[in-house]
Amino acid sequence: MELKRGKTFIKSSLQVSHEKPPDPAAVAAAREGTGPWSVLPGGQQRPHSEKGPQASPSAQEYDRCPNKGAQLDPKGGPAALCGATFKPVRKCKTHDSMSGAGRATAATGQLVGSASFPGSPGSRRMIDYRHFVPQMPFVPAVAKSIPRKRISLKRPKKCFRNLFHIRRNKTEDLASLAAEGKSLPSPGDPSDPGGRRSKAFLPPGEGPGLDGLCQDLLDSELLADASFGLCRALCEDVASLQSFDSLTGCGEVFADESSVPSLELNEGPESPTQAAQGLESKVPRGPLQGSVEQLASPAQNEASDFTRFWDSVNRSVRQQQRALLGPWLSGPQGTDRDQSRLDTAGLAELPLCPCRDPRSGSKASSIDTGTPKSEQPESVSTSDEGYYDSFSPGLEEDKKEAESPGTPAATFPRDSYSGDALYELFHDPSEGPLGPSPDDDLCVSESLSGPALGTPLSICSFRVGAEENLAPAPGPDLLSQGFLQSSWKGKECLLKLCDTELAITMGIVSWLRRGPTPRAPPTPGQPAAPPGSQGAPRAPTEKLGGREGLASDAGGATVCSAPSRQELWAHPGTTGLLAGESKALGGATQGTGTLSRDASREEETRGHSEGLFSSMESAATSTTDTSGKNKAPVPSTWPCSQKEPGPPGVLGCFRGPWRPGHGGDTLDAEPMLAGCVARVAALKISSNEQPPAAWPPRQDMGSGLFGQRWARGPDMLEQKQSSSSPSMTTIHGLPYSASTQDQRCRDRVQDLSWLRVEPTGLGVQAWASVEDQPLQLSTEAVEQVAHGSQLDSEPRSAPAARWSSQGHHPESLGLTLNSQQEGGVSASAPECRCSLLAREGLLCGQPEVGASGPAMAEPHL
């Protein structure tokens, strides 16, 4: 600020002094007058030709100053007058004598010497701008800031040399004046006011000699055009800041070339050159340091730091996202790279920040955000870290950048290259320069130019079913296009980071949720695959018992009936289907029809053996609705539509471990099954009177029973439980549904193959026991048999005995083929007994039968 004022008043003083040029004719006339000196009212000597209006204001001021000094002590004599006015007048006259020397040269054609410099009085005088006070407005700060010892630097030497030349020629001028007959007043005449006045300007004891007269003559003369450049050069050299730091190299921190106008003096001969230099200096290179380097202004430095910070953040975000989501982003967004670059070329022309000086736009300083310093030519400057170096990017590089087709013109200066080390550390050279992204424009939304490369995807872009993409391209919605992908540096970057993390997290969570796809369960009633294939489909609601899986490889009965379906699944080897509709969900026809006649008798015998095998049956029989897949080597129709109401123990066992619907798991029954098989192997089938515990468990019984019950509903189970005695357990043919758990049970039984019992002997013994023992049917059972049809007497052709599920006595539970009321199967008790015995024997006896399930060892034992 002080500098501005200093240059301003220097310029104004020069202009004012130039406004009133002197008249050379008047000066010549003054020399030809009767006396060159005249006394003004104050007593100061003046040329006669010089008029008040023609004299410059500075001369008038100088004149007034000594007048006041003379009036202070009018009677004090020359010594008093000299003591009062000597210092200010002499100092001021020194400057005027310098200016007047050139003026006299133009007027007379000769260089006139000056008394200011070499000579007894002038040798001690130097220009001191602290005493400019009478000539121009007093600015103390400027006066103090200009040291006297620095005045004679550089160009002032030229001025002094010219003045010395003037000093050598001054005697010639005075000789010419004396030849013209000009009479000079004697120095010692006290009456001559001129002599008295002349002594006032000279040291005591000296009269106004030739030097003094020449000094007084040139005191009030003004600058001429010829010497105007010299004075201007002197003033510029004194006031210019460039001269101050030329030797020391210390830059004036507050100096700004763009803000300090140069002296607009167009009168001098060098004015065109200086005007051109002024234009160059007005190109805003920023503040100067040592006339070479540019300092970063606070506004630009702050904004550039902010911009570079967010650029680095965005770059790190893009790199992280490229590493994590690169495979998904490279495809869809790779095509937008060129288009986004071309679009940003137009957007980059917009101003970055409102605080930026509009004039600074003319200086295309570099913004190579994507170009590391290694690609730039080495800087020649000596700038320290933190100072912007005007030579590092240079105008040439900026022009090249502006001319390059793909990259926009640089719009913001880069303070330094301090961050290039980090950039080169993380920059992948294979990717090439990233190029300016729309993030460089603080106020421009990216939605104008499309999504930028590597922009984090919006969390809103996740859609149902798109988890496998993990990061699908965002749809053209408001959030992804206008807001989340805009180029707002501050909050936008944070949103992008959070959004990317959330998107990745959501993708991982959704991927984990999918897990292995569950297999579709087979439709109810779908027959199970043969046991050899072991591909039995799983019934949705029923855990099919392992017995079905135990069906023999030769022709295991596939009895995988659904709970609601009342179908008889015939084994491929079966000769005939059960006559009745067999609503029991799995009445498996696995044998010949001979066994069907023995069903009633078998029920009775089974009634005896139910108590023993209730536990085993609960473990071994799958409570699912599949009918027992007891398959003998010879096919025999097994009326497994067992609708017999089991005693509570049996039902509880069925519902417990084996029936999933009633709270059990087949896996829990496997250990029990192994124990039961061991017990069965140890059992010895005895005579008729033997308690039911003597009978080995029938393993096919559960199928028909539970299939029927499921078909009829859980309430029927309750009724059957109530009707059956706890001692009698339904040892239905231990039906096993075709399920993976059945296969597990089958494997378990295979492992227990060592429990084999001779099927023939066992069957014979069982048959004998069955034949010998009378039918032990309770009255209730007899009534049921009568109601159904002939129990024992009828052969295979006997009509189907219809057993009401509610009316079944525990004794007659077992294998009542007529368990299905609607489609009862005619069965004779002996045949049922035979089948029961055969199945019981084979359960422990034949490994393949064990594997296939509780199958009959013989069709008839």
UniProtKB/Swiss-Prot annotation:
Superkingdom of origin: Eukaryota
Subcellular location: Cell membrane
Biased composition (Basic and acidic residues): 598-609
Biased composition range(s): Polar residues: 362-384, 615-629, 719-730
Broad class of the protein's primary localization: membrane
MF-aspect GO terms: beta-catenin binding; phosphatidylinositol-4,5-bisphosphate binding
Keyword list, A-Z: Cell membrane, Lipid-binding, Membrane, Wnt signaling pathway
A cellular component annotation (GO) from this entry: plasma membrane
Residue runs in coiled coils: none
Compositionally biased residues, Pro residues: 518-530
InterPro entries reported for this sequence: AMER (IPR019003)
Any GO BP annotation: regulation of canonical Wnt signaling pathway
Biased composition (Low complexity): 584-595
Span list, region Disordered: 1-77, 179-206, 261-289, 351-415, 514-558, 576-644, 716-742, 786-822
Recorded topology in the membrane: Peripheral membrane protein
Main function: Regulator of the canonical Wnt signaling pathway. Acts by specifically binding phosphatidylinositol 4,5-bisphosphate (PtdIns(4,5)P2), translocating to the cell membrane.
Family: Belongs to the Amer family.
Protein name as catalogued: APC membrane recruitment protein 3
Protein source organism: Homo sapiens
Upper taxonomic lineage: Eukaryota, Metazoa, Chordata, Craniata, Vertebrata
